[in-house]
Amino acid sequence: MEPSQSINLIILGLIVVMHAGVLALRLGISLARI
């Protein structure tokens, strides 16, 4: 595997984790408001 490929995978993983965190926060806020 080339180093650039692993770096791209790490960036993709970080983006996925960030999106999951944002979705979880939005769900928690919407549930707390109810």
Swiss-Prot record:
The keyword ATP-binding does not apply. One of its GO terms (biological process) is photosynthesis. Disulfide bonds: none annotated. The keyword Transmembrane applies. Its main location: membrane. The chain crosses the membrane at residues 9-29. One of its GO terms (cellular component) is plasma membrane-derived thylakoid membrane. Keywords: Membrane, Photosynthesis, Photosystem I, Thylakoid, Transmembrane, Transmembrane helix. This is Photosystem I reaction center subunit XII. It comes from Prochlorococcus marinus (strain MIT 9515).
